[in-house]
């Protein structure tokens, strides 16, 4: 058995990119989802039935709005059992923040634990080897924070060094990678576990025909958890997926009202400005150019078409506008669009699902010996409240080495 | 009579009750297990053995490992999309290998499986979806167009391209594989919960949902499998030709075979070549059939294309339709090693109620023309339909049965339920029959179908048996039509054997020679076919209505 294993690793490494010494790499990824699956095609019918509404015009409008999200399935924590245990959540104007946090706190820890365990299994190492924990969530609030609850649920060492990134919204996943990268590169031998976990329970509102736009928000967002193990200088038994070469963050002045979330007694209330896709479109290229300058050789050698694009799919409009602005061909954002289709916008988690899709695409290309080559270099991007841009210039280490000269 | 006399009378009445029980000792019914748990108990040890295989060329098959896995996956998928305890899922599938996985998955999720004939009219399927307040429908290409506008989401098994708008079975299962546990746990299914809502055949009255609990089905399986030898576990190959949407198909064939870890050879529609090929190739040992299939086995020249000398077939079983004596004789001549069994069961009693099948070594074979003996754990009595009093042996009365397999009632039909299951738990079957001194039960007829000729009762089945004994008669049905003078008169529809030349009068005369004068057939029609239900029952009510309609203009 041992020799077979070793042979497998040797052959894998032979055809993969070598990581640069001292640079942080993603060594494994993982995910977990809650119990309820929402089939988007049936959201409208269910909504119309639950609200005893048979206005055909409203139904058509909702159907159209649901389709435009391009989401086919999402996973949510909210269930019949929760509504039975907490009937006040379905009533307007009830002070329910406490109940929402009770459910959320439990759910995010449960999902983060499952995602972390799946990730560590895929990594092949032991939980005792984890030196740092970076925990990202915008769905919980408590003392001690979710980072401690997760460390305890996983049985991590009491000496594990914890960081929690709270209320970073959709850019939180990439922010977490940036922080994990910093820790991994500054502490030799560190193995950093990054976990993201989100639920829309805090913002759940009962469906109401008076607020059709609510449904678009509900129809777009999903719940779940993601995880990654990050470390530099992989051992021979580790299989690095991406090298995190350089990470940048930027906020756009005077856009702090565009993504607006307020905690109220009735839960969190979000407002997304309609101008959001336009603001991203107008500012994304300069940010990408700055990231590309971080390339060790002459950055001008890299073109958009030469790179892979792991973009947080905040919504279909953001992806379409990016494609248009940067002139990306339709396949470039495939991993992002698939994640949006299968999981919705799962906030900070989504970038983990996008990266998992890319690993799978690379694996399939390799298996099918496809003509199409993987791009070695690429960008990992996310946009969050602020408006904040998070970006990482990365290398796909599973890409086949191109024949040079 | 003073007040004190009342209890004394009750006691006296109870003393007169003629209740019959099985000659075999009672069998234990396990507590606390659901149907899927009971049926798949011990499946791990048979993980690589074939549980279900489609007879058609290139058909799908499932091992026990796959059945257990996909049953759990589908249950999880149903819960993930919000299906909960008590929710009904209508299944509009033909006989496919996946069928038992679908129904066990539904039950495992705590939901209620309601099978419907995929070849029924769209309006009939829609009626069942609406009456049962189903949350979901499972269908394949056969019924998709009929169910797509029924108002509930459809899970499509099979070719996605041909079922636009359906939730893909594979896609749903894959999506649900990713789901985790709930924050507030889902209510698990209890043995007392409903698990099936078959609609009773509709040969009499309106089609009604029959509410069956896990306990009902588990106890029925325990009773009907009482004589199954443990040492044959994993060896029995059963033919799955009877429709699975019918209670007998899903419990009597699928659940019983899976419980015993045998193999079900799944056939959708009957085709003699595929059928014989399946008997030969899959070494089928037990085949529940309808009489026309046995007729084809005996008479069709197609049968000569196969070497049937080395069949593994041990027994065939017919239920719900009487077997013509000459067909039985011809069948036994051609297949001397095959035991022909009859059974009697009804949906309201979770399936089999009386049977011939005691297996080897139990020392009792019921008489040919009987429907069998009483199964363990059951109580049976025969009541006078007019007085309601129970009758002694050898006296025909309405067959009543009491056991843990008696349904919980008709769905949303309290009145009909009360008319069918009395306060003491007796299920009134509507069938007239009697028990003989050996404990063998004979069914005379349906109460409602008994013909009342000048105050005499005439049993259609008796006249049909006489007609079927005529060498030129291939099939026959008898029913009563209103008559000014007699009240009702017996009318027969007859299918003549190919090449037979006897006229209507000759056949009428043939019957007259063999029955009492009040039983004579008064009108006889030669027809092309006799309409039957999927389980093989003659649709006498339909024949009667058609006959009356045809007669009216001339009257």
Curated annotation (Swiss-Prot), chain A:
GO MF annotation terms: acyltransferase activity, transferring groups other than amino-acyl groups; tetraketide alpha-pyrone synthase activity
Superkingdom of this protein's organism: Eukaryota
Active-site residues annotated for this sequence: 170 (nucleophile)
Any single Gene Ontology cellular-component annotation: endoplasmic reticulum
A biological-process GO annotation: flavonoid biosynthetic process
Alphabetically ordered keywords of this record: Acyltransferase, Endoplasmic reticulum, Transferase
SUPFAM superfamilies: Thiolase-like
Chain positions covered by the region annotation Disordered: 1-20
Subunit text: Interacts with STS1.
Function: Plant type III polyketide synthases (PKSs) that catalyzes the condensation of fatty acyl-CoA with malonyl-CoA to generate triketide and tetraketide alpha-pyrones, the main components of pollen exine and potential sporopollenin precursors. May be involved in the synthesis of sporopollenin precursors in tapetal cells to regulate pollen wall formation. Required for exine and Ubisch body formation in anthers. Does not possess chalcone synthase (CHS) activity in vitro with the substrates 4-coumaroyl-CoA and malonyl-CoA.
Protein name: Type III polyketide synthase 10
Protein source organism: Oryza sativa subsp. japonica
Taxonomic lineage: Eukaryota, Viridiplantae, Streptophyta, Embryophyta, Tracheophyta
UniProtKB/Swiss-Prot annotation, chain B:
EC number annotated for this UniProt entry: 6.2.1.12
Binding site for ATP: 200-204, 208, 342-343, 347, 431, 446, 537
Cofactors required: Mg(2+)
Residues binding CoA: 269, 454-455
Region called SBD1, residue ranges: 271-342
Binding locations of (E)-4-coumaroyl-AMP: 248, 320, 343, 347, 448, 452
Coiled-coil annotated residue ranges, if any: none
Keywords: ATP-binding, Ligase, Magnesium, Nucleotide-binding
Keyword Magnesium: yes
Molecular function, one GO term: ATP binding
GO-annotated cellular components: endoplasmic reticulum
TM region positions: none
BP-aspect Gene Ontology terms: fatty-acyl-CoA biosynthetic process; phenylpropanoid metabolic process; sporopollenin biosynthetic process
Region (SBD2): 343-410
Reactions performed catalytically: (E)-4-coumarate + ATP + CoA = (E)-4-coumaroyl-CoA + AMP + diphosphate; (E)-4-coumarate + ATP + H(+) = (E)-4-coumaroyl-AMP + diphosphate; (E)-4-coumaroyl-AMP + CoA = (E)-4-coumaroyl-CoA + AMP + H(+)
InterPro entries given in the database record: AMP-bd_C, AMP-bd_C_sf, AMP-binding_CS, AMP-dep_synth/lig_dom, ANL_N_sf
Domain of life of the organism encoding this protein: Eukaryota
Protein task: Carboxylate--CoA ligase that may use 4-coumarate as substrate. Follows a two-step reaction mechanism, wherein the carboxylate substrate first undergoes adenylation by ATP, followed by a thioesterification in the presence of CoA to yield the final CoA thioester.
Comment text on domains: Both substrate-binding domains (SBD1 and SBD2) are involved in the substrate recognition, and are sufficient to confer the substrate specificity.
SUBUNIT field: Interacts with STS1.
Family (UniProt): Belongs to the ATP-dependent AMP-binding enzyme family.
Protein name: 4-coumarate--CoA ligase-like 9
Gene that produces this protein: 4CLL9
């Amino acid at each position: 058995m041992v020799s077979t294993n070793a042979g497998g690793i040797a052959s894998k490494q032979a055809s993969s990119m070598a990581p640069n010494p001292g640079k942080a790499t993603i060594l494994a990824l993982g995910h977990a989802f809650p119990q309820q699956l929402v089939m988007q095609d049936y959201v409208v019918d269910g909504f119309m039935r639950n609200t005893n509404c048979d206005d055909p015009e409203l139904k058509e409008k909702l159907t159209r709005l649901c389709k435009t999200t391009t989401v086919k399935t999402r996973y949510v924590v909210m269930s019949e059992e929760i509504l039975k245990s907490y009937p006040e959540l379905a009533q307007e104007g009830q002070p329910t923040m406490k109940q929402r946090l009770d459910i959320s706190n439990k759910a995010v820890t449960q999902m983060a634990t499952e995602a972390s365990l799946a990730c560590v299994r895929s990594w092949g190492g032991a939980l005792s080897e984890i030196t740092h924990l970076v925990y990202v969530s915008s769905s919980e609030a408590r003392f001690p924070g979710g980072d401690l609850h997760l460390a305890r649920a996983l049985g991590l060492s009491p000496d594990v060094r914890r960081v929690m990134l709270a209320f970073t919204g959709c850019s939180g996943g990439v922010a977490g990678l940036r922080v994990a990268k910093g820790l991994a590169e500054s502490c030799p031998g560190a193995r950093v576990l990054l976990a993201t976990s989100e639920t829309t329970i805090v913002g759940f509102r009962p469906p109401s025909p008076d607020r059709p736009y609510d449904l678009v928000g509900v129809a777009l967002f999903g719940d779940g958890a993601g995880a990654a193990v990050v470390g530099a200088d992989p051992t021979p038994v580790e299989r690095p997926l991406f090298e995190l070469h350089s990470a940048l963050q930027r906020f756009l002045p005077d856009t702090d009202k565009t993504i607006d979330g307020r905690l109220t007694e009735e839960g969190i209330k979000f407002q997304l400005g309609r101008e959001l896709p336009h603001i991203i479109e107008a500012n994304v290229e300069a940010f990408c150019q700055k990231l590309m300058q971080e390339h060790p050789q002459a950055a001008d050698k890299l073109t958009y078409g030469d790179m892979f694009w792991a973009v947080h799919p905040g919504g279909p409009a953001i992806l379409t506008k990016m494609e248009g602005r940067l002139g990306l061909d339709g396949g470039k954002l495939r991993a992002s669009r698939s994640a949006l289709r299968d999981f919705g916008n799962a906030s900070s988690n989504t970038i983990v699902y996008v990266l998992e899709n890319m690993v799978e695409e690379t694996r399939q290309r390799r298996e099918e010996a496809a003509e199409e080559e993987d791009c070695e270099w690429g960008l990992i991007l996310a946009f969050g409240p602020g408006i904040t841009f998070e970006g990482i210039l990365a290398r796909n280490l599973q890409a086949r080495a191109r024949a040079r000269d | 009579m003073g007040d004190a006399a009342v209890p004394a009378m009750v006691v006296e009445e109870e003393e007169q009750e003629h209740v019959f029980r099985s000659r075999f000792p009672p069998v234990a019914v396990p507590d606390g297990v659901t149907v899927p748990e009971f049926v798949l108990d011990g499946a791990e040890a048979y993980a690589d053995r074939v549980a279900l295989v489609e007879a058609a060329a290139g058909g799908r098959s499932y091992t026990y490992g796959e059945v257990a896995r996909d049953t759990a996956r589908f249950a999880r998928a149903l819960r993930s999309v919000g299906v909960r305890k008590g929710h009904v899922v209508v299944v509009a599938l033909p006989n496919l290998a996946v069928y038992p996985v679908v129904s066990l998955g539904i039950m495992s999720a705590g939901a209620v499986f309601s099978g419907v004939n995929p070849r029924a009219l769209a309006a009939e399927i829609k009626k069942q979806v609406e009456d049962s307040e189903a949350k979901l429908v499972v269908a394949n290409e056969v019924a998709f167009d009929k169910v797509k506008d029924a108002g509930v989401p459809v899970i499509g098994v099979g070719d996605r391209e041909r079922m636009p708008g359906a939730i893909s079975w594979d896609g749903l299962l894959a999506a649900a594989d990713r789901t985790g546990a709930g924050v507030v746990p889902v209510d698990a299914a209890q043995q007392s919960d409903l698990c099936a809502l078959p609609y009773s055949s509709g040969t009499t009255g309106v089609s009604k949902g029959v509410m069956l609990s896990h306990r009902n089905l588990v106890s029925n399986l325990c009773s009907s499998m009482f004589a199954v030898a443990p040492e044959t576990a994993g060896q029995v190959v059963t033919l799955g030709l009877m429709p699975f949407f019918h209670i007998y198909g899903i419990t009597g064939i699928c659940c019983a075979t899976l419980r015993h870890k045998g193999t079900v050879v799944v056939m959708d529609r009957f085709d003699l070549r595929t059928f014989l090929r399946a008997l030969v190739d899959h070494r089928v040992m037990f085949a529940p059939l309808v009489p026309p299939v046995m007729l084809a086995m005996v008479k069709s020249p197609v049968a000569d294309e196969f070497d049937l000398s080395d069949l593994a077939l041990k027994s065939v079983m017919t239920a719900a339709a009487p077997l013509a004596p000459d067909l039985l004789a011809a069948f036994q001549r051609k297949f001397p090693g095959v035991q022909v069994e009859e059974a009697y069961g009804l949906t309201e009693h979770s399936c089999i109620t009386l049977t011939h099948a005691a297996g080897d070594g139990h020392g009792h074979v019921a008489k040919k023309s009987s429907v069998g003996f009483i199964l363990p754990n059951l109580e049976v009595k025969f009541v006078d339909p007019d007085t309601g009093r129970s009758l002694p042996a050898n006296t025909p009365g309405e067959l009543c049965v009491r056991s843990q397999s008696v349904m919980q009632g008709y769905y949303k039909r309290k009145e009909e339920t009360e008319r069918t299951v009395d306060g003491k738990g007796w299920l009134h079957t509507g069938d007239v029959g009697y028990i003989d001194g050996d404990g063998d039960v004979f069914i005379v007829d349906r109460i409602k179908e008994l013909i009342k000729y000048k105050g005499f009762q005439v049993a259609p089945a008796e006249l049909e048996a006489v007609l079927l004994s005529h060498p030129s008669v291939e099939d026959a049905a008898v029913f009563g039509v209103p008559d000014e003078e007699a009240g009702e008169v017996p009318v027969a529809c007859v299918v003549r054997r190919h090449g037979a030349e006897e006229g209507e009068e000759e056949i009428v005369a043939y019957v007259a020679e063999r029955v009492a004068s009040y039983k004579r057939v008064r009108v006889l029609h030669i027809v092309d076919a006799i309409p039957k239900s999927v389980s093989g029952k003659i649709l006498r009510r339909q024949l009667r209505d058609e006959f009356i309609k045809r007669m009216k203009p001339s009257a």
